[in-house]
UniProtKB/Swiss-Prot annotation:
One of its GO terms (biological process) is translation. PROSITE patterns: RIBOSOMAL_L11. One or more lysine residues are methylated. It comes from the Bacteria. GO terms for molecular function: large ribosomal subunit rRNA binding; structural constituent of ribosome. Part of the ribosomal stalk of the 50S ribosomal subunit. Interacts with L10 and the large rRNA to form the base of the stalk. L10 forms an elongated spine to which L12 dimers bind in a sequential fashion forming a multimeric L10(L12)X complex. CDD domains: Ribosomal_L11. One of its GO terms (cellular component) is cytosolic large ribosomal subunit. This is Large ribosomal subunit protein uL11. It holds the Pfam family Ribosomal_L11. Forms part of the ribosomal stalk which helps the ribosome interact with GTP-bound translation factors. It comes from Aquifex aeolicus (strain VF5).
């Protein structure tokens, strides 16, 4: 028989830098999960990413206090800010542009995010990422909408 799911917890954690401090400790502690075990497993699983990269993680807690977790790819906004070399998006994206990326960078980000998106079409994924870039005030050189 399958284990009974008690809770599903969604967190955004820095790769290789998870610690028992908030938000991890309180979120897992209230469900009786071994926090240090999660921290060790998450930090080991996030070795492929640059330290500090923000990763969404979905933790499923079972009745016997065991857990499983799924790491997703970094958010599109994080990847766009990194590619454009900006600290944050524009407060007025229609008038104030904060950075530029190339179509090649757009394609790389779309390919990276494909497994988390609900499309298998690269062009559709690129349009989705381009929409996020537009709402952040990041221009895409050579992109025709």
């Amino acid at each position: 028989m399958a284990k009974k799911v008690v809770a599903t917890i969604e967190l955004m954690l820095p790769a290789q830098q998870a610690s028992p401090a908030p938000p991890v400790g309180p979120a897992l502690g209230q469900h009786g999960v071994n926090i240090m075990e999660f921290v060790k497993q998450f930090n080991a699983a996030s070795r492929d990413y640059e330290p500090g990269t923000i990763l969404p993680v979905v933790i499923t807690v079972y009745q016997d206090r065991s857990f499983t977790f799924i790491m997703k790819t970094p958010p599109v906004s994080y990847l766009l800010k990194k590619a454009a070399g900006v600290e944050k998006g524009s407060s007025d994206p229609k008038r104030v542009k904060v950075g530029k990326i190339t179509v090649k960078q757009l394609e790389e980000i779309a390919k990276m995010k494909m497994k988390d998106m609900n499309t298998r079409d690269l062009k559709a994924a690129m349009r989705t990422v381009a929409g996020t870039a537009k709402s952040m005030g990041i221009e895409i050189e050579g992109w025709k909408e």
